Amino acid sequence: MEMAKEQELILVLDFGSQYNQLITRRIREMGVYSELHDHEISIEEIKKMNPKGIILSGGPNSVYEEGSFTIDPEIYNLGIPVLGICYGMQLTTKLLGGKVERANEREYGKAIINAKSDELFAGLPAEQTVWMSHSDKVIEIPEGFEVIADSPSTDYAAIEDKKRRIYGVQFHPEVRHTEYGNDLLNNFVRRVCECKGQWTMENFIEIEIEKIRQRVGDRRVLCAMSGGVDSSVVAVLLHKAIGDQLTCIFVDHGLLRKGEGDMVMEQFGEGFNMNIIRVNAKDRFMNKLKGVSDPEQKRKIIGNEFVYVFDDEASKLKGVDFLAQGTLYTDVIESGTKTAQTIKSHHNVGGLPEDMEFELIEPINTLFKDEVRKLGIELGIPEHLVWRQPFPGPGLGIRVLGEITEDKLEIVRESDAILRQVIREEGLEREIWQYFTVLPNIQSVGVMGDYRTYDHTVGIRAVTSIDGMTSDFARIDWEVLQKISSRIVNEVDHVNRVVYDITSKPPSTIEWE
């Protein structure tokens, strides 16, 4: 992303750590903008971005293995502060003349370090708990470096070259398990990199609007509205930037939540005076999905059909060159990068046909979910809309496990409406990050009245999270769960059992498909 000259930037280089997004997350919480980029970024690109500091993430590789990820060593000569985390510290050590070798045993979990008071640990206690996750270790530091922290298992828990402002830590300050991790990162960002911390949603809007206007010019944009928070925020942001040059296409694919379609038209079409075309494509989607049970195939079909519908609608309009989507930072990482395997394709970043005739605009693809909500409030979207439950582009299509039918959709739609109503009545909307029902491809025996039943099972998924990268199941009061279960079984046809998902992410994803 091309940033305005006055925008402070901390550049994070990706070496494949499962925590790399958390690094950018933590820095943004300090009011400093941060982006994650591939480790192969060129020196010229870095100079153009003009970052105040560079962080090298952790990663699963060993620095001494053939083909392991590396960087241009010239990065250390740019005069820009550098912080290497875990693999990033080991790589720094190797590239600057130190030595790294495989440890006798992998160190994973909490550890106690003893830190010296310096720039990185300024104001922090000497003894502190950190989170280790590595199988290699530094055995000799480069010339010019000093040890600033050690632990029972390593003499080099943290190192520094104060003159060149190059630092390394063997642990992960970005994870919550590291006791003073945020403080350490804050010291690097504020004390070492001298960032003031002035990044806000207000200046994000200013920068993004200017970028949109420069790119679009006098041309027209189609915005893909799904009914979810992300696409709604994108639509309002674009409308603020280019006004009537924006046409929103709201595809009613028959996979929406109860009352979703009418709500979108009322709140955004009328409320924001936006040009929204509602397309009834239910039969088209259901025909394509008939007999399909594989979740990846369903996602691809829904993603493709979305774009084909837009293509059909765009052919009725003149001069439309762009398609806007509500892709998030987490969407991109979960679909895999050069350093991370694909967990599952996302509807906004996978499934797009090669012959698509639009250029993509994804104005919030560097934001996390909670940042999108803050952006929505700043744009003037009412709180009750901004805090609506996250809803994936494929809609209920990925909350019906296996083949999708009208009857199954109705079960999910009605049970989900009950869940949302009870959560709202109990005042739990802000306490639970995401909650919804799913319909597993499971039937079981039950007794209702005096009769034996053999009907469907509904699953409830409710999680707590900050940004969607990790989550834990919500500890909902048993009486509330019983109320939800009782209402679903009694009010939704063909359901005789309700179960509650108590797995975290990882190992599970939030959505079931």
UniProtKB/Swiss-Prot annotation:
It comes from the Bacteria. HAMAP family: GMP_synthase. Pathway: Purine metabolism; GMP biosynthesis; GMP from XMP (L-Gln route): step 1/1. Coiled coil: none annotated. CDD domains: GATase1_GMP_Synthase, GMP_synthase_C. GO terms for cellular component: cytosol. Its EC number is 6.3.5.2. Keywords: ATP-binding, Glutamine amidotransferase, GMP biosynthesis, Ligase, Nucleotide-binding, Purine biosynthesis. ATP binds at S226, G227, G228, V229, D230, S231, S232. It comes from Staphylococcus aureus (strain MSSA476). Catalyzes the synthesis of GMP from XMP. One of its GO terms (molecular function) is GMP synthase activity. Residues 9-198 form the Glutamine amidotransferase type-1 domain. The active site is at C86, H172, E174. Homodimer. Pfam families: GATase (PF00117), GMP_synt_C (PF00958), tRNA_Me_trans (PF03054). Residues 199-388 form the GMPS ATP-PPase domain. It catalyses: XMP + L-glutamine + ATP + H2O = GMP + L-glutamate + AMP + diphosphate + 2 H(+). This is GMP synthase [glutamine-hydrolyzing]. PANTHER family: GMP SYNTHASE [GLUTAMINE-HYDROLYZING], GMP SYNTHASE-RELATED.
